[in-house]
């Protein structure tokens, strides 16, 4: 299944990189690459792996080694990555 990252999800990755990069640019790169890798590896082969999402019609993949959740929506031909949220942030009402 093809993964498609929304503009908001890409902005989330950029914000994560900028925040972590203030202290350690190499760590920022590792975290962002790990998030992308986890999404592509886990979701492309098994889109139902995530739990039902808090927003209707979405699912959430909890990233085990990192404090992030990837919100996504399964479409007919692809999987849409909606957001990449830190677990301590308030969850949006809509995606």
Model-identified regions with their sequence ranges:
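A short catalytic or substrate-binding loop motif that flags glycine-/basic-rich loops and adjacent residues
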Residues: 62-65
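Basic, Lys/Arg-enriched alpha-helical interface segments
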Residues: 2-58, 94
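Short, exposed beta-strand "edge-strand" segments with a Pro/Gly-rich flavor and a Y/T-containing core
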Residues: 1-5, 86-89
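Enriched for short, Lys/Arg-rich terminal
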Residues: 68-95
